Every structure is written in C-alpha cells, then in structure tokens.
UniProtKB/Swiss-Prot annotation:
The gene is pheS. It comes from Clostridium botulinum (strain Hall / ATCC 3502 / NCTC 13319 / Type A). GO terms for molecular function: ATP binding; catalytic activity, acting on a protein; magnesium ion binding; phenylalanine-tRNA ligase activity; transferase activity; tRNA binding. One of its GO terms (biological process) is phenylalanyl-tRNA aminoacylation. This is Phenylalanine--tRNA ligase alpha subunit. The lineage of its organism: Bacteria, Bacillati, Bacillota, Clostridia, Eubacteriales. NCBIfam families: pheS (TIGR00468).
C-alpha cells in the first residue's frame, strides 16, 4: 500500500512538471484528489487494513495528499503570475510612440441654427419661454380656437397619450401658458421639439424642432408682424433675400398668412426644389384671433397681437442647402463634420 502511494505521488509530480494551463491542473486534481481519484480510492479502502497498518498507511496517504495539494497550489500560482506578466506586457504603452488623436465633435447644424434664430429675436427684444412636451388637450387645441371635432384637428396626426394628454404638435401651447401667466405687453419666442405622426421621408419626421413667436400689446398691427419677419429673414439669410406674404387660414389667427422666401438653391430663378416658382414657404403667421385672447383673459378690444411659427429643420435645410431632413437625425459624422 505504501508503495502504491509513492507511485501515485511520483506520477502526480511528473504530470505537474509538464502542466501549462489551469485546465490541465484541474484535470490532475480530479484524477488524484477527486471523488473518484486514485488517492481518494486508497483512503476509502483503509477500512480493510489491519489496526497496525492503518495509522502508518493513513499518515503516508495524508502526506501524499498534502504534497499534491500544495504542489497544485504552487503550480496554479505560477501559471497565474505568468498570465499576468504576459497581459501586462501586451498592455504596456510605449510612451515614445505618437498618441492617437481623440475625435473632436462639432456643434449640430440644428443647434447652430437655433442659436442664430434665438440671437436674432433676442436682439429685437423677445424673451424665450418654455413649456412641457407632454401637453394638455386644452393648451394644444382648445385654447387655440381648435375645439373637439374641429376640421383642423384632422390636419395634424397627433400622438395621444390619453383623451386629455398629447405629445404637443406645436409650440403654440407655450404662447397660451405665457398669456395666462403674464400681462401684456408680451414679446416672446418658444423654441422646442414637437411631435407629429408622420411617416419618415426626405421632408417629414415624427419629431422635429419648431419655433413660434408672439407679440401682444396695445396697437399691434399686421405691419408690425411684416416688419418683424422681414427683418428676421434678412438677418438669417442675408440682405439679398426677398420675401412675400400670401393669404392663408389658421384657426388661431385672423387674418392669417404664409411668408415665402426666395429659393436657397436657385436664388429665385426656378428649380426642382422650389418647383420652378423661385419661392419656398418659410413660415405661417397672422394676427392673434380675438377668441384666443379671450381664452387667456385678455380683452381684444384693448389689446391686439401677432403670432408666427416655423420649422427649425426647414430653416436648417434652407440655410445649408440640405435636401433630406433625415440627415439631421442620423448622427453620421461624415455629414456633421461639414458644419
């Protein structure tokens, strides 16, 4: 029995000398010390030995077991240290090599355009107001002279959260909230994201940016509206830009109009973008409807006002000659690095 134990010890030593991996170490441990291992089987058979042999063989068996366990432990530690050394060597940074430049981001054209638009209106005395993107039906529709079952609601595919909550389809609700909370004179713009249930294509997106403006005071006329927007267009697109106003209809303004600007592609000569007309629709505007003023407890016999609104994305496309709105939302650095 003692000879068998010595053979097991020597066999384990020889195998451990050629071990190169943790998996091989585990296989050796199982072979000799596992539940069905060679040394374990001997220890289980000690009951068949005589009382004189049992303590002698038990002592030798425990010594062999301890030796194998300690040798495996040392081998495991050596392998672990070698792996660590290899890893550290591979991870070593050669400080004499030139470093890799970090990619530098640029401001998004939407952000640049929004800032330009804000600066222009701030220079004209406008303040910036904000409001929630999840809006009450009252502010998004009813207070803007768009009651339930009004035909204008069918023109805006709306994301409804429930019967009384929507994702705002315009930033006009901010105008209503401002008129409720402030007394005239009011001169404000409301930039922000809006949501429409539109299919994505070159000119439509379910999420886009809009900026609306409102002026309410005594004696405000359509001439004030026209002068403000013409000045904005020249500061935004240059002194050579031409504008014109066309009659239109909006439920919340009366009279209403749309303002066109000379095409940014052909400079008014006529092309595919402007469909040969030389003009591109820029924004909608009009005098605030008397009922909208009444809805905000402002007397239309004393005060009047004008409002306007435009898509910021459209402004970006006009300013930079971009023909596909999807480029603004794809985060393609090849495109964004041009600005």
């Amino acid at each position: 029995m003692r000879q068998k134990l010595e053979e097991i010890k020597n066999s384990a030593i020889n195998e451990l000398k050629t071990t190169l991996s943790k998996d091989q170490l585990e296989a050796i441990r199982v072979k000799y010390l596992g539940k069905k291992g060679e040394l374990t089987q001997i220890l289980r058979g000690m009951g068949a030995l005589s009382q004189e042999e049992r303590p002698i063989v038990g002592k030798v068996a425990n010594e062999v077991r301890s030796y194998i366990e300690e040798t495996i432990k040392e081998a495991f530690s050596d392998i672990k240290n070698k792996e660590k050394s290899i890893r550290l060597e591979n991870e070593t940074i050669d400080i004499t090599m030139p470093g890799k430049k970090q990619a530098v981001g640029k401001r998004h054209p939407l952000d640049l355009t929004l800032e330009s638009m804000k600066d222009i209106f701030i220079s004209m005395g406008f303040t910036i107001e904000e409001g929630p993107e999840v809006e009450l039906d009252k502010y998004n529709f009813e207070a803007l002279n768009i009651p339930k079952n009004h035909p204008a609601r069918g023109e805006q595919d709306t994301f409804y959260i429930n019967d009384n909550l929507v994702l705002r389809t315009q930033t006009s609700p901010i105008q209503i909230r401002t008129m409720e909370n402030q007394k005239p004179p009011i001169k404000m713009i409301a930039p922000g994201k809006v949501y429409r249930s539109d299919s994505v294509d070159a000119t439509h997106s379910p999420i886009f940016y809009q900026m609306e403006g409102l002026v309410v005071d005594k004696g405000i006329t359509f001439s004030d509206l026209k002068g403000t927007l013409e000045l904005f267009a020249k500061r935004m697109f240059g002194d050579k830009v031409k504008t014109k106003f066309r009659p239109h209809h909006f439920p919340f303004t009366e009279p209403s109009a749309e303002m066109d600007a000379t095409c940014f592609v052909c400079n008014g000569e006529g092309c595919k973008v402007c469909k040969g007309s030389g003009w591109i629709e820029l924004l909608g505007c009009g005098m605030v409807h008397p009922q909208v003023l009444r809805n905000c407890n402002i007397d239309p016999e004393v005060y009047s006002g004008f409002a306007f609104g435009f898509g910021v994305d459209r402004m970006v496309m006009m300013k930079y000659g971009i023909d596909d709105i999807r480029l603004l939302y794809e985060s393609d650095m090849r495109f964004l690095n041009q600005f």
